[in-house]
């Protein structure tokens, strides 16, 4: 190694590394809070104009299903189809919410797959 070359890890690089570590810690703390927030959220999926509702958490955990008594005369197959449609609606809303919140959390970072 020639005089003055070192390892190429000077003071500027150390500051960059320290900033990157700090940002990673902030993201980790934010991710923990986000997970807690998602668990507390209630996201509603609907079908048949609200006659069927599926409520799930922000991380896609099913909470409850609400079916209007007016639908019970329609038969099991119709009710099952509407519950499925409401589940899909809730899932889509939940994953969209999760993705948006993750983008907010990781904003400004160059992370693969985000």
UniProtKB/Swiss-Prot annotation:
UniProt keyword annotation of DNA-binding present: yes
Gene Ontology molecular function: any one: DNA binding
Protein name per UniProt: Nucleoid-associated protein Cyan7425_0899
Coiled-coil stretches noted in the UniProt entry, renumbered to this chain: none
NCBIfam families attached to this UniProt entry: DNA_YbaB_EbfC
Keywords: Cytoplasm, DNA-binding
Annotated family: Belongs to the YbaB/EbfC family.
This protein's GO CC annotations: bacterial nucleoid; cytosol
Highest taxon above the source species: Bacteria
Major site of localization recorded for this protein: cytoplasm
Gene3D superfamilies membership: Nucleoid-associated protein YbaB-like domain
Annotated localization: Cytoplasm, Nucleoid
SUPFAM superfamilies: YbaB-like (SSF82607)
Function text: Binds to DNA and alters its conformation. May be involved in regulation of gene expression, nucleoid organization and DNA protection.
Subunit record text: Homodimer.
């Amino acid at each position: 190694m020639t005089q003055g070359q070192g390892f190429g890890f000077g003071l500027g690089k150390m500051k960059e590394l320290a900033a990157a570590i700090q940002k990673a810690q902030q993201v980790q703390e934010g991710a923990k809070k986000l997970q807690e927030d998602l668990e507390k959220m209630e996201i509603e999926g609907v079908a048949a104009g609200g006659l069927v509702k599926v409520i799930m958490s922000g991380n896609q955990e099913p909470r409850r299903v609400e079916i209007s008594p007016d639908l019970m005369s329609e038969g099991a197959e119709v009710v099952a189809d509407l519950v499925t449609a409401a589940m899909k609606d809730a899932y889509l809303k939940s994953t969209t919410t999760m993705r948006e919140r993750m983008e907010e959390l990781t904003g400004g970072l160059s992370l693969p797959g985000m």
